[in-house]
Amino acid sequence: MSGVRGLSRLLSARRLALAKAWPTVLQTGTRGFHFTVDGNKRASAKVSDSISAQYPVVDHEFDAVVVGAGGAGLRAAFGLSEAGFNTACVTKLFPTRSHTVAAQGGINAALGNMEEDNWRWHFYDTVKGSDWLGDQDAIHYMTEQAPAAVVELENYGMPFSRTEDGKIYQRAFGGQSLKFGKGGQAHRCCCVADRTGHSLLHTLYGRSLRYDTSYFVEYFALDLLMENGECRGVIALCIEDGSIHRIRAKNTVVATGGYGRTYFSCTSAHTSTGDGTAMITRAGLPCQDLEFVQFHPTGIYGAGCLITEGCRGEGGILINSQGERFMERYAPVAKDLASRDVVSRSMTLEIREGRGCGPEKDHVYLQLHHLPPEQLATRLPGISETAMIFAGVDVTKEPIPVLPTVHYNMGGIPTNYKGQVLRHVNGQDQIVPGLYACGEAACASVHGANRLGANSLLDLVVFGRACALSIEESCRPGDKVPPIKPNAGEESVMNLDKLRFADGSIRTSELRLSMQKSMQNHAAVFRVGSVLQEGCGKISKLYGDLKHLKTFDRGMVWNTDLVETLELQNLMLCALQTIYGAEARKESRGAHAREDYKVRIDEYDYSKPIQGQQKKPFEEHWRKHTLSYVDVGTGKVTLEYRPVIDKTLNEADCATVPPAIRSY
């Protein structure tokens, strides 16, 4: 090992010498495409060896840095550049490989193209869908901004599906209603057939090319640069050559996506590893509501690939082994278009009670073949292809085998509706200076305990834009960037070096699989205290096993072994907070369904008139947000709670929706 390490140090010294010429030497080859940090701004980069003589560190300075280049990150980045800010965007993937591309169904907005609609009805549905854990000021902001956001996308060139008279086509989607739940099913979901995320991401990427944003493509963000409680940028690893980069900025936006890969079966990309959530945790800041994990009702059985809710919006139905449309029993009004948590639980109950399909009776069927073939070809072309590839099913002739699959994380980095990251001190929310978050990485909280389908793409564009607007309101391009310590980021580099030379007994892939299976078995659609407690013990033990990892690639150029190990560290922090938060929450709400605590525990019993009832103390009810912290050294999880925000931004224009019994 000493020989390997010595050779590595020699190579590192050579890289340091090369790095000193880095600001003036352009890379060659086609990989420079859309990599504008290689352009005229390179002169602003400076090499520092103050962290480590073995790891070259290149310092950069920008007005703002965005971490992540999915829908939320792109919208924030080009919004800042458009406003004149010198902006960097750090992404471990080429932008169009981000997980936004996998979203299928659509984006909600009360355009009223199919029938009369109102954004306040959308607001009501979102609050109800959140099981009254959503913050109503943020939901007000998102739903009111939705129509303008969709029109903006259309103006950018997004090729929405159209009605015969040329308007944007809107399909039915789960949990959507008219007239505050009293007017029947709403058609509010704007779509591009069943490839809406693909079109949205490519549209935003195309728009981003108009602006002079510096893209650090295939750079892995290691940690935030924090000084005196303020965020002053990010430190990142260049995956291509192994150099370390400190990107100092007055404003940092975290848009790194979710942490779906904490589970064994999920629709998330393999890169959805909770990087931003973990960076926040290592910075000593809280994460919020991580126990609320959405299981999408229709993942392909055995593969986990997403089958959009748009199938049911177009008229598809779920059936059990008896050919029964079973959702009529669980949600008599909405049926197959009930909220996702309701449908996933109903499917699980059907399987438990022996009405599952297939030889093992462990899934149900999604039937589409009763729909006209031309409708399937025009509205659901991607699903037809996916079902054939991953299930061997011709959707015009036979049903698709489906099973609830982890799909979305309602929890994340706590923010207000302006995208500003929050900490909770002495019972009060405080803004973390210089730090913003948006997209699935953030928890605004517009989704509460359960997200409505087609609100995620809306979340991306509305709050990506909101982050840019917030920074524009509080800063000016060229404002002085606060300094950082000469050794800022030293711990991140030490951790990287430790993992690079890790020589334990457990492979990264083995430990990751153990974590994923433990989460799948102990924190699934239905949860129970004894199983959650066992899961807490198992995940804590697995977290301790990180010290026994073994990596095999000691190099620094395209070391995917090292990157996957860094991602595993991030996933472990997310898994800890998810399962400990779930064990502590002694109720059922939204996607968090406890079999030992089957009811929602609010400050009042909303199944009865509240007149004459005594309000439960904050400590005795669960209509509150979980805030979780992790001691990174020991893996100990600490939980706190903060109130849900019930007030809207303007009560006269949009009244608060009081809690009620949630049914569909």
From Swiss-Prot:
Pfam families: FAD_binding_2, Succ_DH_flav_C. GO terms for molecular function: electron transfer activity; flavin adenine dinucleotide binding; succinate dehydrogenase (quinone) activity. Phosphorylation at Tyr-215 is important for efficient electron transfer in complex II and the prevention of ROS generation. Acetylated. Deacetylated by SIRT3. This is Succinate dehydrogenase [ubiquinone] flavoprotein subunit, mitochondrial. Residues 1-42 form a transit peptide. It catalyses: a ubiquinone + succinate = a ubiquinol + fumarate; (R)-malate + a quinone = enol-oxaloacetate + a quinol; (S)-malate + a quinone = enol-oxaloacetate + a quinol. The gene is SDHA. Changing C189G: In LS; decrease in succinate dehydrogenase activity. InterPro entries: FAD-dep_OxRdtase_2_FAD-bd, FAD/NAD-bd_sf, FRD_SDH_FAD_BS, Fum_R/Succ_DH_flav-like_C_sf, Fum_Rdtase/Succ_DH_flav-like_C, SdhA/FrdA/AprA, Succ_DH/fumarate_Rdtase_cat_sf, Succ_DH_flav_su_fwd. The keyword Nucleotide-binding does not apply. Its EC number is 1.3.5.1, 1.1.5.-. It comes from Homo sapiens. The keyword ATP-binding does not apply. GO terms for cellular component: mitochondrial inner membrane; mitochondrial matrix; mitochondrion; nucleolus; respiratory chain complex II (succinate dehydrogenase). It is found in: Mitochondrion inner membrane. Belongs to the FAD-dependent oxidoreductase 2 family. FRD/SDH subfamily. Keywords: Acetylation, Cardiomyopathy, Disease variant, Electron transport, FAD, Flavoprotein, Leigh syndrome, Membrane, Mitochondrion, Mitochondrion inner membrane, Neurodegeneration, Oxidoreductase, Phosphoprotein, Primary mitochondrial disease, Transit peptide, Transport, Tricarboxylic acid cycle, Tumor suppressor. The modification N6-acetyllysine is found at residues 167, 179, 182, 250, 335, 480, 485, 498, 517, 538, 541, 547, 550, 598, 608, 624, 636, 647. Oxaloacetate binds at H296, R340, H407, R451, A454. GO terms for biological process: mitochondrial electron transport, succinate to ubiquinone; nervous system development; proton motive force-driven mitochondrial ATP synthesis; respiratory electron transport chain; succinate metabolic process; tricarboxylic acid cycle. Its cofactor is FAD. It is linked to Mitochondrial complex II deficiency, nuclear type 1: A disorder of the mitochondrial respiratory chain with heterogeneous clinical manifestations. Clinical features include psychomotor regression in infants, poor growth with lack of speech development, severe spastic quadriplegia, dystonia, progressive leukoencephalopathy, muscle weakness, exercise intolerance, cardiomyopathy. Some patients manifest Leigh syndrome or Kearns-Sayre syndrome. MC2DN1 inheritance is autosomal recessive. Leigh syndrome: An early-onset progressive neurodegenerative disorder characterized by the presence of focal, bilateral lesions in one or more areas of the central nervous system including the brainstem, thalamus, basal ganglia, cerebellum and spinal cord. Clinical features depend on which areas of the central nervous system are involved and include subacute onset of psychomotor retardation, hypotonia, ataxia, weakness, vision loss, eye movement abnormalities, seizures, and dysphagia. Component of complex II composed of four subunits: the flavoprotein (FP) SDHA, iron-sulfur protein (IP) SDHB, and a cytochrome b560 composed of SDHC and SDHD. Interacts with SDHAF2/SDH5; interaction is required for FAD attachment. Interacts with TRAP1. Interacts with LACC1.
